[in-house]
From Swiss-Prot:
GO terms for biological process: actin crosslink formation; cellular response to starvation; microtubule bundle formation; negative regulation of microtubule depolymerization; protein localization to microtubule plus-end; regulation of microtubule polymerization or depolymerization. Residues 168-204, 278-509, 536-681 are annotated as: Disordered. The modification Omega-N-methylarginine is found at residues 487, 504, 633. Residues 186-199, 354-365, 475-493, 557-571 have a biased composition (Low complexity). This is GAS2-like protein 1. Involved in the cross-linking of microtubules and microfilaments. Regulates microtubule dynamics and stability by interacting with microtubule plus-end tracking proteins, such as MAPRE1, to regulate microtubule growth along actin stress fibers. SMART domains: CH (SM00033), GAS2 (SM00243). Gene3D superfamilies: Calponin-like domain, Gas2-like domain. Residues 291-303 have a biased composition (Polar residues). GO terms for cellular component: cytoplasm; stress fiber. InterPro entries: CH_dom, CH_dom_sf, GAR_dom, GAR_dom_sf. It comes from Homo sapiens (Human).
């Protein structure tokens, strides 16, 4: 007679697929072990989830059970585990050092005293850190089997194993006869051993057949997997003569497979060919199947590829149809698509540092090619997200938008900058380059000042503008009316030029009118200066020196050597601030302390340039013995309303009181406009 245990092991080895459901019965085993330990020691361990392992994490329950097994072994005649373990049972926190020490003590006892195989052992981290709960459960089941041989209470699964073993060892003529030898020793408790709790009886098998039929009825295939009932809890599966033992463990239908247990659902998934080749019977299982249904588009497109990225993913949608079919069915009118919601003329991508000519080169030559290729096919170097396939796309940017883009870029550029770097770049379209350069020359003009003080308007491309850079444009003589005529013929106003660019464009005047305007401004400055000097001369401030014998003026600042308007403003501001003698005196007539020297910074100028400190008196001893000395004064600035600089400077020696005279700087501005009025032009 063949060994029945070998037949059960062979049925597990002949499965269609590898054994992957070893974790399916872990939850059922944890529930069984929790009930077993609660019955032995009156604990309150939860059966499901992480509560069971959390209750065992301290190791006290494990060590307590080890001592119980040792005491049961002492009652036997055979020398079984002869030494217990010492452990800490009070104030133990899961994950602490004492908890780890208790778990390690139990592991050492199982390995040395109980002789548990190494394949069923677990490590400390497996229980404390939940790294491998399956090993913990299998080790506890093995310890329960060893304890059941000594007369201890066994879990329900161990009782099922004992029932199955008795049924397999029973002879056919006498099925009710008890097994002899080792089986009697294992199941009967040792004499004299006290009862350790109520004995758990096997569950009733009356509902087992109904549960099995319910699980088999989930498969709706015409040719179902055969599972024939031989007796209570014994079934023959498939076309072979292999027998399986089925038991009910609470809400789980368990199957005895080899030396362990498995659920009936996973057992059928491994052995039923219909369940192996289809995923309809296992919707919650994440296993990889041999057949994976793919999404197929209901309408096939005649083109192999679509220029719109992502159209393959939307091919299964019924409302998406090919362009060719859409044109034949609906005519020239195209139904709305998600891509049609984008603006019709998307702006080209501009990077920081791009010049105007580089932007025009990106829109001149390649623009026509892109507009021609948009509606023909998927020929693209880089797929654009804003292209549409319904109708031929229009050019991405009309010529009018070219000037608008230049205006946007010129907002952050200085007005006095010379020709941009775009003039040195090669442009594919010469006509567009010439037209864009002419617009730049007409729109941006620079003020050029010669050595003799003459001012004139110069196009940006003709002069360096003080920056030292030159452009390859050829200087051309233009008449005063030429820019206006060319500007009217320019297509920019017709195509919607930005109004802001018109206001930023300097006024174009005739050179003669410019010179006449400058002369009027100079005459107005001189007239105002004379009027202010006349008002200031009414106040008695001391003898006014003769302009003919005025001392040599100090070297003025280099920033005002070539600027006629700036020097004129110096004289005006000097007259407004009054005489320096008034500012250097106090209420009692004595000279006050010298005022703080002004900074040379153009942003921190003084509103009164004539004020600088006490001046030399003609009759004072210091004026006779010491030659005239030039005092450092603050540079005049274009911002007279600003306060003087706070930078401290050394103070000079005080001079005795006496009649003050006009400062040399004020005398210079009061004489020079009268003496040489034509030199400023």
């Amino acid at each position: 007679m063949a060994d029945p245990v070998a037949g059960i092991a062979g049925s597990a080895a002949k499965s269609v697929r590898p054994f992957r459901s070893s974790e399916a019965y872990v939850e059922a085993m944890k529930e069984d072990l929790a009930e077993w330990l609660n019955a032995l020691y009156g604990l309150g361990l939860p059966g499901g989830g992480d509560g069971f392992l959390t209750g065992l994490a301290t190791g006290t329950t494990l060590c307590q059970h080890a001592n119980a097994v040792t005491e049961a072994a002492r009652a036997l005649a055979a020398a079984r585990p002869a030494r217990g373990v010492a452990f800490q049972a009070h104030s133990v926190v899961p994950g602490s050092f004492m908890a780890r020490d208790n778990v390690a003590t139990f592991i050492g006892w199982c390995r040395v005293e109980l002789g548990v195989p190494e394949v069923l052992m677990f490590e400390t981290e497996d229980l404390v850190l939940r790294k491998n709960e399956k090993s913990v459960v299998l080790c506890l089941l093995e310890v329960a089997r060893r304890g059941a041989r000594l007369g201890l209470l066994a879990p329900r699964l161990v009782q099922f194993e004992q029932e199955i073993e008795r049924e397999l060892r029973a002879a056919p003529p006498a099925p009710n006869a008890p097994a002899a030898g080792e089986d009697t020793t294992e199941t009967a408790p040792a004499p004299g051993t006290p009862a350790r709790g109520p004995r758990m009886t096997p569950s009733d098998l009356r509902n087992l057949d109904e549960l099995v039929r319910e699980i088999l009825g989930r498969c709706t295939c015409p040719d179902q997997f055969p599972m024939i009932k031989v007796s209570e809890g014994k079934y023959r599966v498939g076309d072979s003569s292999l027998l399986i033992f089925v038991r009910v463990l609470r809400s789980h239908v368990m199957v005895r497979v080899g030396g362990g247990w498995d659920t009936l659902e996973h057992y059928l998934d491994k052995h039923d060919p219909c369940r192996c080749s289809s995923t309809a019977h296992r919707p919650p299982q994440p296993r990889v199947c041999t057949f994976s249904p793919q999404r197929v588009s209901p309408t096939t497109s005649p083109r192999p590829a679509s220029p719109v990225p992502g159209s393959e993913r939307r091919g299964s949608r019924p409302e998406m149809t090919p362009v060719s079919l859409r044109s034949t069915k609906e005519g020239p009118e195209t139904p709305p698509r998600p891509r049609d919601q984008l603006p019709p003329h998307p702006r080209s991508r501009r990077y920081s540092g791009d010049s105007d000519s580089s932007a025009s080169s990106a829109q001149s030559g390649p623009l026509g090619t892109r507009s021609d290729d948009t509606g023909t096919g998927p020929r693209r170097e880089r797929p654009s997200r804003r292209l549409t396939t319904g109708t031929p796309a229009s050019p991405r940017r009309p010529p009018a938008l070219r000037s608008q883009s230049r205006d946007r870029l010129d907002r952050g550029r200085p007005r006095g900058a010379p020709g941009g770097r775009g003039a040195q770049l090669s442009v594919p379209s010469p006509a567009r380059r010439a037209r864009s350069q002419s617009r730049e020359e007409q729109a941006v003009l620079l003020v050029r000042r010669d050595r003799d003080g003459q001012h004139s308007w110069v196009p940006r491309g003709r002069g360096s503008g003080g920056s030292g850079r030159s452009t390859p444009q050829t200087p051309r003589a233009r008449s005063p009316a030429a820019p206006r005529l060319s500007r009217v013929s320019s297509p920019s106003p017709e195509l919607g030029t930005t109004p802001a660019s018109i206001f930023r464009t300097p006024l174009q005047l005739d050179p003669q009118q410019e010179q006449q305007l400058f002369r009027r401004l100079e005459e107005e400055f001189l007239a105002n200066a004379r009027a202010l000097e006349a008002v200031a001369s009414v106040t008695p401030t001391g003898p006014v020196p003769d302009p003919a014998r005025a001392p040599d003026p100090p070297a003025p600042d280099s920033a005002y050597c070539s600027s006629s308007s700036s020097s004129s403003s110096l004289s005006v501001l000097g007259g407004k601030c009054g005489q320096p003698g008034d500012s250097g005196r106090t209420a009692n007539g004595l000279p006050g302390p010298r005022s703080q020297a002004l900074s040379s910074s153009s942003d921190e100028g003084s509103p009164c340039p004539g004020m600088g400190g006490p001046l030399d008196a003609p009759g004072s001893p210091l004026a006779c013995t010491e030659p005239s000395r030039t005092w450092a004064r603050g540079r005049m600035d274009t911002q007279p309303d600003r306060k003087p600089s706070r930078i401290p400077t050394p103070r000079g020696p005080r001079r005795p009181s006496g009649p003050a005279e006009l400062g040399t700087w004020h005398a210079l501005h009061s004489v020079t406009p009268r003496a040489e009025p034509d030199s400023w032009m």
